[in-house]
Amino acid sequence: MIILTYNIPYNLISFVNEVIMNTDELYVTIGGIKQNILITYTDVNKPILLILHGGPGSPDRPLVNKYNNDLAEDFVIVCWDQRCSGLSFTKESKKTPLTPELMLSDLKELVEFLLNKYSKEKLYIAGHSWGAYLGLWFASKFPDYLYYYIGTGQGISSTLDEIEKYNFVLSQAQKRNYEKVIQRLISYGAPQSGIYPNSHNSASNYVGKLIHKYGGYIHPNNDFSTNKYFSLYL
């Protein structure tokens, strides 16, 4: 495995409860392409916590930094920009179609790299949204690599998820008497087996925006910095 280090003149240092926090950014060759990881820690001897973002394509470093950085007092936190996402989005990454199997292979390779780098036998994985699907799949395939798997926003059935989202935004629009929104949702039709019968991509994106608008993604949804970040993906 080839490792390329992203050189920074000095470690980024922040103070959380008077604890010095160090940050290392690395480019690691995974699955034949360079992929970026951000490692935050106070003590490299702490257990590893690998965080899997959602999407695919929604790296969550700003949210981890804002809400979860204190975990670095107890863990070596690793944020991975998955292929075609964030700092891992390159010309090379676009040459190979994304598949769940490819992402699982990338994850396995990254886990093995981290365990070797820090001389560990196991680590923790926390997955969110799409990352929760990927993390749970990894846990079922390779349990010996893990102490625990933690799922947040854990998906179980994408088919059920789509219909629940549609019903939520439709009911919210009806409560607000948003007739144009109601008619547009009706024109798309309720998803069947996870697929909208009319203009699936347009419908899925529209429903996603409405969920955010109606408070279904982030709580509280009046947080300016979080909303500004999240709006980039909607």
What are these regions (language model features)?
Residues 1-16, 20:
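Membrane-interface motif at the C-terminal end of an N-terminal transmembrane signal
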Residues 176-234:
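Alpha/beta-hydrolase
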Residues 38-87:
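Conserved HGGG/HGGXW glycine-rich cap/lid loop of the alpha/beta-hydrolase fold
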Residues 84-101:
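Cap/lid segment of the alpha/beta-hydrolase catalytic domain
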Residues 120-163:
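Conserved hydrolase catalytic core segment
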Residues 148-192:
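A catalytic-pocket lid/entrance helix-loop region that shapes and gates access to the active site
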Residues 102-122:
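Conserved acidic catalytic loop of the alpha/beta-hydrolase fold
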Residues 14-41:
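N-terminal cap/lid segment of alpha/beta-hydrolase-fold proteins
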